[in-house]
Amino acid sequence: MASSLGDNFNLLSPQQQELVKMLLDNGQEHLFRDWPAPGVDDDHKNAFFDQLTRLDSSYPGGLEAYITNAKRLLADSKAGRNPFDGFTPSVPTGETLAFGDENYIKFEEAGVLEARKAAFVLVAGGLGERLGYSGIKLALPAETTTRTCFVQNYIESILALQEASSQGESQTQIPLVIMTSDDTHGRTLELLESNSYFGMQPTQVTLLKQEKVACLEDNDARLALEPQNKYKIQTKPHGHGDVHALLYSSGILKVWYEAGLKWVLFFQDTNGLLFKAIPSALGVSAAKQYHVNSLAVPRKAKEAIGGITRLTHSDGRSMVINVEYNQLDPLLRASGYPDGDVNCETGYSPFPGNINQLILELGHYIEELSKTGGAIQEFVNPKYKDASKTSFKSSTRLECMMQDYPKTLPPSARVGFTVMETWLAYAPVKNNAEDAAKVPKGNPYHSATSGEMAIYRANSIILRKAGVQVADPVVQVFNGQEVEVWPRITWKPKWGLTFNRIKSKVSGNCSISLRSTLAIKGPNIFIENLSVDGALIIDAVDDAEVNVSGSVQNNGWVLETVDYKDASEPEVLRIRGFKFNKIEQLETKYSEPGKFHLKA
């Protein structure tokens, strides 16, 4: 049984011996080949078993399940099996919202009240290297007018929901979980601690670290060893689908359920608009009693974003899931839609675009995870050396995605979606300047440049809908990307959590010129008959009520271009292609409670 280990086998603990037997039974003899006798390399051997134990304990069902799943998926991949065989696609049911109308406001207000029964899970990505930024992505400023980083924006948004949903009763702390990795864990903790958790109680935030999975060297799912170290298995990330198993094994879901929570909201790391969409989507979940609600945006046919689709199998099974755009078109063509993925009379595809933000009903979620242990349907994507598909160019591994959770749900599960306009809900930052500049004209750049400009656009459009005269945008080019430049308007989440709140704080005849910057940093700032042509920064503590009126006219902050190759500029500016030259501004700070009037 353990012959390749020789006398080393007798030195192992009973648990380690069981692990070895299982590995040998599953075709992993090569792991112990050429091991020297006891007394040689013992420290390395112990480290190897520590790693094996870690890999075994962090995967639902252990390494045996991982190897079994890998053999099946690798065989399917080699045979070219299509995971959608037997499924017919159709348009699922969901709710489409138009910002600011009666229906939208109804859901938004309902969602704010529901938020006291919610927990948030931030599936934090890795480092910002792909963006040309050396820090963690959560530390990246969402916009450079106030330099608010993504995680600060998220936490302040959750705290704003926490306060608004309490309605005068004692505040219920809304918990936040952040999934980290080896690369990001320490830096995420440091970012939170050095900023006093951006206003949250440290006990409100839980960091769960994701482990990697073993790499596979061939179609027999033999675990790959490091080329330079026969006592170490190669590992790679398993994907953000791990979040479900981590939440389940941590026991935190049960704690939430016993505390009376009802919703778990999953979101990703660099979408500066996301929380504008969350209250209304949560309101939809509550009204429709959805077990799963995917936030979505209108999507053009064949656009490079997954489509939310109902799949019905010939055996009667059905599910509502995200189908990647490159799979959706051929699937439709093979199912009696000769033109594949085409726009309908709305000008958009009937299959809405998945933006990877999920709202799950907690009780149903726990029930499902107790059956699966949090395991999510996986896939494998080996890079084969040639058409024979017998060997790989480099080792591969199994992967899983958070949004594939509904694949294991029974047909009785209520799975729906909420579509919101892209300008309001979706501006991810995931492409660096060079890659974004190569994006075909008309397609979204998804860069730091477009992400920041999208925040100003959304805030400008919202204020317009609230009755403010906001100047029309102009198109400018930064880092080779044509973007709409609107007035640089920002506010704290506590000021503008919902459309109703914003409307209640803006009155009379207000106007903002194109070259203006307006930063509202306080919840109780009221704007009445205000004209801004320049830069105005108002900072006030929670208990300071400030009424602002009159005419602000100064030289303002001038937008200047920055070359992404200019090493004399900081990374956060280079990746955007612009910076602000702060020539002149009216800046006021109210640090005491009371009522104040700023007449410009």
From Swiss-Prot:
Q: What does this protein do?
A: May function as the terminal enzyme of the myo-inositol oxidation (MIO) pathway. May also play a role in the salvage pathway for synthesis of nucleotide sugars.
**InterPro entries per the UniProt record, alphabetical:** Nucleotide-diphossugar_trans (IPR029044), UDP-sugar_pyrophosphorylase (IPR039741), UDPGP_fam (IPR002618)
pH dependence of this protein's activity = Optimum pH is 7.5-9.0.
Instruction: Name the keywords, alphabetized.
Output: Nucleotidyltransferase, Transferase
Q: In which tissues is it expressed?
A: Expressed in root tips, young leaves, flowers and developing embryos.
Transferase is among the record's keywords? yes
Query: What is this enzyme's catalytic activity, as reactions?
Result: a monosaccharide 1-phosphate + UTP + H(+) = a UDP-monosaccharide + diphosphate
Protein's name according to its UniProt entry: UDP-sugar pyrophosphorylase 1
Its family remark reads:
Belongs to the USP family.
Q: Which organism is it from?
A: Glycine max (Soybean)
Organism lineage string: Eukaryota, Viridiplantae, Streptophyta, Embryophyta, Tracheophyta
Q: Which GO terms describe its molecular function?
A: UDP-N-acetylglucosamine diphosphorylase activity; UTP-monosaccharide-1-phosphate uridylyltransferase activity
Cofactor(s) required for function per UniProt: Mg(2+); Mn(2+)
This protein's encoding gene: USP1
E.C. numbers: 2.7.7.64
A GO BP annotation = UDP-N-acetylglucosamine biosynthetic process
